[in-house]
């Protein structure tokens, strides 16, 4: 994948950054694409770096993801909760599966969606081959993860656990407005504020 380079003029001459490093200077992390261990490690490292830079200043996590590996997503989620710096989440495009869970896990009052973004929650997917006893062990594990993910969505959204369990039995798609009513986000933003306010 080709990553654009940004060139800035400084008092000491020119300085070039890849676009993601330049965004990081403004405390913006971009999570685009499927979530796996590699992506999770990069996002976690950026969260920890920005926390060390200024633990009181907002971090802005932009999400455009179809979801991915549950344990990788949970590693990002737990880090968001662990650090002191408030994490604002913004859905651009889509936040599905683990992407939706991360979107809901932003600082309350600072969870956003752009106008035409789509949000989707569902139960975790899994496939395992092997001996019958191993398949049974993995089935039990995925059921435990399903229960925990539903509890987190219920806690973050304010919905009853029973409703979340029913809604996640199948793919449950939402517009920004529907996600706001559900409690996954707090507001829809059509334009970035010109001064002050959230990003």
Curated annotation (Swiss-Prot):
Subcellular location: Cytoplasm
One Pfam family of this chain: CLP_protease
Catalyzed reaction equations: Hydrolysis of proteins to small peptides in the presence of ATP and magnesium. alpha-casein is the usual test substrate. In the absence of ATP, only oligopeptides shorter than five residues are hydrolyzed (such as succinyl-Leu-Tyr-|-NHMec, and Leu-Tyr-Leu-|-Tyr-Trp, in which cleavage of the -Tyr-|-Leu- and -Tyr-|-Trp bonds also occurs)
GO cellular component: cytoplasm; endopeptidase Clp complex
Source species, domain of life: Bacteria
InterPro entries listed in its UniProt record: ClpP, ClpP/crotonase-like_dom_sf, ClpP/TepA, ClpP_Ser_AS
A biological-process GO annotation: protein quality control for misfolded or incompletely synthesized proteins
Keyword flag Calcium: no
Record keywords, A-Z: Cytoplasm, Hydrolase, Protease, Serine protease
Catalytic activity, EC: 3.4.21.92
Active site: 97, 122
GO molecular function: ATP-dependent peptidase activity; ATPase binding; serine-type endopeptidase activity
Function: Cleaves peptides in various proteins in a process that requires ATP hydrolysis. Has a chymotrypsin-like activity. Plays a major role in the degradation of misfolded proteins.
Family: Belongs to the peptidase S14 family.
NCBIfam families, per database record: clpP, PRK00277.1, PRK12553.1
Oligomer and partners: Fourteen ClpP subunits assemble into 2 heptameric rings which stack back to back to give a disk-like structure with a central cavity, resembling the structure of eukaryotic proteasomes.
Alphabetical list of HAMAP family matching this protein: ClpP
UniProt name for this protein: ATP-dependent Clp protease proteolytic subunit
Organism: Geobacter metallireducens (strain ATCC 53774 / DSM 7210 / GS-15)
Organism classification: Bacteria, Pseudomonadati, Thermodesulfobacteriota, Desulfuromonadia, Geobacterales
Protein encoded by which gene: clpP
């Amino acid at each position: 994948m080709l990553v654009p380079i940004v060139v800035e003029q400084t008092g000491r001459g020119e300085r070039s950054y890849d676009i993601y490093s330049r965004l990081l200077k403004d405390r913006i992390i971009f999570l685009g694409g499927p979530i796996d261990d590699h992506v999770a490690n990069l996002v976690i490292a950026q969260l920890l770096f920005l926390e060390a830079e200024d633990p009181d200043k907002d971090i802005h996590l932009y999400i455009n993801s179809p979801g991915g590996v549950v344990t990788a997503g949970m590693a990002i989620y737990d880090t968001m909760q662990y650090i002191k710096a408030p994490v604002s989440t913004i859905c651009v495009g889509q936040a599905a599966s683990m992407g939706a869970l991360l979107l809901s896990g932003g600082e309350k009052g600072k969870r956003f969606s752009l106008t035409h973004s789509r949000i989707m929650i569902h139960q975790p997917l899994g496939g395992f081959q092997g001996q019958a006893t191993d398949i049974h062990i993995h089935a039990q594990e995925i059921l435990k993860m399903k229960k925990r993910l539903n509890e987190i969505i219920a806690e973050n959204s304010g919905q009853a656990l029973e409703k979340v369990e029913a809604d996640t039995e199948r793919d449950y798609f939402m517009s920004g407005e529907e996600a706001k009513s559900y409690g996954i986000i707090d507001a829809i933003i059509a334009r970035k504020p010109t001064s002050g306010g959230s990003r």
